[in-house]
């Protein structure tokens, strides 16, 4: 991880600013190789359970000697967040459902999931999608089992005419130095889905980049022509890297890679990753990464039905990106 703090230019006031992440030095070109286990590592439960229809959106962190996976489960009516624990990141034990949407609050009744977990001095912070229109909430925990919600969204949709006026989703939060950064999906009036970034001093009060979006859908006929989403960001080998999901015109979903030196200006790379097993033949999405040297472990969602949301027979797989200089 880079040291230091973000560069901020106060070009105005309110909840928008100009900033970058700490500058990365760059370096030699890097070749990435993808390999994945053939079978899912976290599967749907039996009919009638809270995660019987889809299991997607892993967010994996280390807690001592264990891996904690905060994943999303769909029961046919609503999305919930559950916790699974593993000693090796491969064999998982489902602990419990930990968050469900609260209809008596801003969250509504359809979703409290699609989240991103990180740790700081206060414990575990879990940023999740909820509400209609969708926005980003925050829950905190000391142990991963008992949670306290923030009460109001920490990141809200943009004003009329903005790139994210219809709603937000797919948060992915990282820390560099003293800063928190959230990469997220925004949807405009035409329902185009792009990616943006926000920054925070404390993980609670956020301001959006004035120049959002930072990653847009591709041209007609490309793998991401229908939208981009579900980012996962890390730093290694002199750059920031982003795995993201692209949706094509037939709603097939694939993963792709982008690169940046400042976390704001991104270049899409040629690498596109498609599912190659029957269970993820139509959709591969929702990456969550842990970096260990030249090896990036990637938990991801997959399905065998081409659909932009749920009912894809979703399950969670495990892969690796291995890097080497040219």
PLM region spans:
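Sec-dependent bacterial lipoprotein signal peptides
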Residues: 1-11
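Carbohydrate-active catalytic/glycan-binding domains of CAZyme proteins
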Residues: 12-326
């Amino acid at each position: 991880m880079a040291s230091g703090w973000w560069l901020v230019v106060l070009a105005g006031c309110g909840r928008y600013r100009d900033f970058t992440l700490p500058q990365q030095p760059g370096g030699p070109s890097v070749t990435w190789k993808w390999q994945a286990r053939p079978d899912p590592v976290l599967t749907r439960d039996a009919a009638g359970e809270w995660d019987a229809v889809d299991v997607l959106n892993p967010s994996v962190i280390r807690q001592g000697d264990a891996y904690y996976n905060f994943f999303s489960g769909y029961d046919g009516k609503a999305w919930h967040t559950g916790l699974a624990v593993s000693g090796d990141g491969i064999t998982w034990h489902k602990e419990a459902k930990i968050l469900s949407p609260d209809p008596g609050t801003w969250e509504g009744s359809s979703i409290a999931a699609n989240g991103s977990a990180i740790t700081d001095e206060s414990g575990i912070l879990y940023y999740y999608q909820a509400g209609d229109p969708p926005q980003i909430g925050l829950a905190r925990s000391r142990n991963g089992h008992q949670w306290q919600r923030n009460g109001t969204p920490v990141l809200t949709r943009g004003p009329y005419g903005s790139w994210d006026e219809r709603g937000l989703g797919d948060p992915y939060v990282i820390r560099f130095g003293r800063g928190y950064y959230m990469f997220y999906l925004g949807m405009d009036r035409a329902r185009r889905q792009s990616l943006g970034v926000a920054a925070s001093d404390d993980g609670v009060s956020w301001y959006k980049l004035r120049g959002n979006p930072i990653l847009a859908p591709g041209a007609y006929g490309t793998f991401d022509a229908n939208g981009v989403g579900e980012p996962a960001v890390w730093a290694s080998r002199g750059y920031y890297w982003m795995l993201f999901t692209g949706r094509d015109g037939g709603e097939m979903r694939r993963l792709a890679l982008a690169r940046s030196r400042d976390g704001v200006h991104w270049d899409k790379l040629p690498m596109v990753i498609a599912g190659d097993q029957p269970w993820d033949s139509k959709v591969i999405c929702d990456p969550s990464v842990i970096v260990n040297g030249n090896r990036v472990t990637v938990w991801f969602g997959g399905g065998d039905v081409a659909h932009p949301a749920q009912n894809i027979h979703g399950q969670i797989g495990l892969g690796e990106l291995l890097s080497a200089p040219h």
